Amino acid sequence: VTTLKQVTIFCDGSSLGNGQQSQRAAAVALLGYKGYWRAVGEYLGRATNQQAEIAAAAVGLESLRQPCQVNVFTDSRYVVETMNGRFRRKTNLPWWERLDRAAGPHKVHWEWTRGHVGHLVQEAADKAARGIAAAGHVDPIILRDAVDKVGTVDDTAID
């Protein structure tokens, strides 16, 4: 019996100027495995806050190279409730399809975490997503700063 790797993902999306012509959105995920972290991000261009949140979870899951047991933490109730089947999918269907494909190979537990209350890993993902949205491209320095901020937080002790 093969045991799946236990991975923790904190993800956050950001849409600066949401609903405006100059809208810039980004998605970031911080992945933890045995106390080690890495960050992945994607510049989305014009996308809403909701779309950026969906993309952030997809970006994290897409970066996994093999099927894993994954705890995904997000401050988006929209993502958690939809992926847990409690909200119906009426809009953003291509975004949900991407997330479904990304989640497919994995055993995923979706968990909501309150945003902007000082949780170190969530705050690092939030700051990185805002930074990439503002920059208009994925800046490796922003991602490295997020990982440096998190350090070696024990992802196995997060609940």
What is the predicted function of each stretch?
Residues 46-50, 54, 89-92:
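Flexible, glycine- and charge-enriched loops at secondary-structure boundaries
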Residues 2, 118, 148-151:
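N-terminal non-cleavable signal-anchor helices
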